[in-house]
């Protein structure tokens, strides 16, 4: 009887177990301001502070579409260094969501920064449903996305690495334009890098169609070849400019 009373007292005085709160996933989208533009103050701050210092050691010059239109679109950029994210950013005062490999999010410092500027983590093979849905969400909210379709930094002598699936499929599904950002050559210290920015293109002939993997590969290759062509066009432009100077 005494034991039963003790057990009853213990049950009454026992503190209820605290339920573990689930960590709420941070909202990936950015609200539009009064002018209807999606601005990331932190990204603008980084551009204002970091870009001038970066330009001193690795100067660059923009060619082509220096001021990209407001609204949803996908930047497609080739990839040499971690600082390549700078080049699309300087073409707009709106925010950009960068699609980055998951490993970058685990890197101390870099991972914190990517999360703070609303980066999207993805597997390198492009088969990441959650990442793709986040991309859709941002574009449908009227925001910009940047994809490096080579999937990794180009450390080879090749003009352009093969493109992974992603950029074309997302642009077609969301019916948004693509803007190419071509880094003409690998950025080097104290040598000017040429950055060529295209006018927006739309893959309207594929809108509303369900494409096979093979068809998407063909469209991805079309994007890749266009960037290679942009490099050749710029080479011709520089050569003609040089000839005029020698006359």
What are these regions (language model features)?
Residues 49-50, 116-122, 152-155:
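Short, basic, glycine/proline-bearing loop/turn elements
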Residues 2-38, 132-247:
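Non-catalytic C-terminal accessory region of glycerolipid acyltransferases
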Residues 69-126, 134:
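Catalytic core of membrane glycerolipid acyltransferases/transacylases, capturing the structured
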Residues 25-67, 87, 108-117:
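A transmembrane-helix-recognition feature enriched in membrane-embedded lipid enzymes
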Residues 59-64, 83-85, 132-134, 165-167:
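A generic local structural motif
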Residues 67, 80, 185-187:
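Short polar/acidic secondary-structure junctions
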Residues 62, 99, 120-122, 181, ...:
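Hydrophobic residues at beta-strand termini and immediately following loops
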């Amino acid at each position: 009887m005494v034991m039963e009373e003790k057990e009853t007292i213990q049950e009454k005085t026992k503190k209820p177990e605290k339920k573990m709160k689930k960590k709420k996933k941070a909202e990936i989208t950015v609200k539009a301001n009064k002018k209807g533009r999606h601005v990331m103050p932190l990204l603008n701050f980084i551009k204002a502070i970091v870009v001038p210092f970066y330009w001193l050691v690795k100067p660059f010059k923009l060619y082509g579409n220096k001021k990209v239109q407001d609204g949803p679109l996908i930047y497609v950029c080739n990839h040499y260094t971690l600082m390549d994210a700078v080049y699309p950013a300087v073409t707009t005062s709106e925010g950009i969501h960068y699609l980055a490999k998951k490993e970058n999010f685990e890197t101390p410092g870099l991972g914190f920064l990517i999360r703070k500027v609303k980066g999207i983590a993805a597997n390198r093979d492009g088969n990441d449903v959650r990442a793709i849905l986040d991309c859709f969400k941002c574009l449908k909210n009227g925001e910009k996305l940047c994809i490096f379709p080579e999937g990794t930094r180009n450390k080879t002598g090749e003009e352009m690495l093969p493109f992974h699936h992603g950029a074309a499929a997302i642009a077609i599904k969301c019916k948004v334009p693509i803007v190419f950002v071509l880094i003409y050559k690998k950025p080097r210290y104290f040598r000017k890098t040429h950055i060529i920015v295209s006018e927006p293109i739309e893959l309207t002939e594929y809108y509303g169609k369900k494409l096979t993997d093979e068809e998407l590969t063909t469209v991805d290759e079309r994007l890749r070849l266009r960037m290679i062509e942009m490099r050749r066009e710029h080479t011709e432009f520089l050569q003609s400019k040089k000839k005029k100077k020698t006359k």
